[in-house]
Amino acid sequence: MSNWLVDKLIPSIMRSETQKSSVPEGLWHKCPSCEAVLYRPELEKTLDVCPKCHHHMRIDARTRLDIFLDADGREEIAAELEPVDRLKFRDSKKYKDRLSAAQKQTGEKDALIAMSGKVLNVPVVACAFEFSFMGGSMGAIVGERFVRAANVALEKRCPLVCFSASGGARMQEALISLMQMAKTSAVLARMREEGLPFISVLTDPVYGGVSASLAMLGDVIVAEPKALIGFAGPRVIEQTVREKLPEGFQRSEFLLEHGAIDLIIPRAELRSRLARLLAQMQKLPTPVETSQVTAKA
């Protein structure tokens, strides 16, 4: 190749490499179900539900509460509580290092957020699990925040709603995490004695100690479409029983068909339908529907 051609082409190639237009990170998202490539701002308008196949994608706990609660009058409960590595637990990593990494990734102190507020002007206390924080696992702080949220509901004489998304008990806290199953179940028994409603909303996924305790103790148990719900995962069960499981086993539709849950409600309808349900359970006037907030209000 002649020198003049090299001199001409090389600078041109280098300029094109350095001058490539930069696309903001996270602008496009691939649906994990149908693999459609979706424009992130448009996806936010549908509350992270794929407009092509209606797959309900996982959303973080704060977005979940932003979608559900009225904008005014929210108050976070027990936000000051932080997990402590009392057992000095270590597997492939130190527990305190796992906590630090999860806190940095999510911006949360632990895997449950609780708030008091209103939904369509109906007073409520709401909790949401943060699955990105160590798989939404339930340790001492998750259990304590849930109990404090229930106590606020008892004090205010209002219902409790919990959006679960969890892999179960947090193994790094050993028996301390298992205690939370009894602890959360006990406070829900108090709510039942006081005649205060508890609605459990199961989102993808709900497993282990959470599904074996608070998640399945709702006066009404609701799930999002196609959420995975169970105690052990399908693969573990298949390996144990050495049989092929039925189609759709552990999906919310399968559980509804077999009477394990009461309702399946699409995400876009959760706010209005739960508000009406809460009002009916307390014999309050039917709430007036307002426009559904988006994930990024």
Swiss-Prot record:
GO biological process: fatty acid biosynthetic process; malonyl-CoA biosynthetic process
UniProt pathway: Lipid metabolism; malonyl-CoA biosynthesis; malonyl-CoA from acetyl-CoA: step 1/1
A GO molecular-function descriptor: acetyl-CoA carboxylase activity
Compartment annotation: Cytoplasm
Domain CoA carboxyltransferase N-terminal: 27-296
One Gene Ontology term, aspect cellular component: acetate CoA-transferase complex
Superkingdom: Bacteria
Zinc finger (C4-type): 31-53
Residues that bind Zn(2+): 31, 34, 50, 53
The entry's keywords: ATP-binding, Cytoplasm, Fatty acid biosynthesis, Fatty acid metabolism, Lipid biosynthesis, Lipid metabolism, Metal-binding, Nucleotide-binding, Transferase, Zinc, Zinc-finger
Catalytic activity: N(6)-carboxybiotinyl-L-lysyl-[protein] + acetyl-CoA = N(6)-biotinyl-L-lysyl-[protein] + malonyl-CoA
Cofactor descriptive note: Binds 1 zinc ion per subunit.
EC number(s) from the headed UniProt entry: 2.1.3.15
UniProt keyword annotation of Lipid metabolism present: yes
Principal EC category: transferase
Matching Gene3D superfamilies: 2-enoyl-CoA Hydratase, Chain A, domain 1
InterPro entries tied to this protein: AcCoA_carboxyl_beta, Acetyl_CoA_COase_Trfase_b_su, ClpP/crotonase-like_dom_sf, COA_CT_N, Znf-ACC
Cofactor(s) the protein needs: Zn(2+)
SUPFAM superfamilies: ClpP/crotonase
Protein role: Component of the acetyl coenzyme A carboxylase (ACC) complex. Biotin carboxylase (BC) catalyzes the carboxylation of biotin on its carrier protein (BCCP) and then the CO(2) group is transferred by the transcarboxylase to acetyl-CoA to form malonyl-CoA.
Quaternary structure and interacting proteins, as annotated: Acetyl-CoA carboxylase is a heterohexamer composed of biotin carboxyl carrier protein (AccB), biotin carboxylase (AccC) and two subunits each of ACCase subunit alpha (AccA) and ACCase subunit beta (AccD).
Family, similarity comment: Belongs to the AccD/PCCB family.
Name used for this protein in its record: Acetyl-coenzyme A carboxylase carboxyl transferase subunit beta
This protein's encoding gene: accD
